[in-house]
Amino acid sequence: MSSFDQTMQFHFSEEPAETNIREVLLTVYDALQEKGYNPINQIVGYLLSGDPAYIPRHKDARTLIRKVERDELIEELVKFYLQGQRKD
């Protein structure tokens, strides 16, 4: 039987997406801080505008943040914030 006749399986990484997003945000935050920028203002500017010029190339931060969709970044930030506010 030819290998083209067999069903292939694709396996996703077992690492949750949130971990990657958190790592990206923390790396970007550190890079901004090291360059002397206000990290919160710069990240908000990027999230609102989509302009990668708000993020420096230092520590490959610009490349990292562009690998994640802005809506996914916002979703992760909102989830983290709301989970921290709950007193259940």
UniProtKB/Swiss-Prot annotation:
InterPro entries: IreB
Domain of life of the source: Bacteria
Record-stated family: Belongs to the UPF0297 family.
HAMAP family membership: UPF0297
Name this polypeptide is given: UPF0297 protein GWCH70_2489
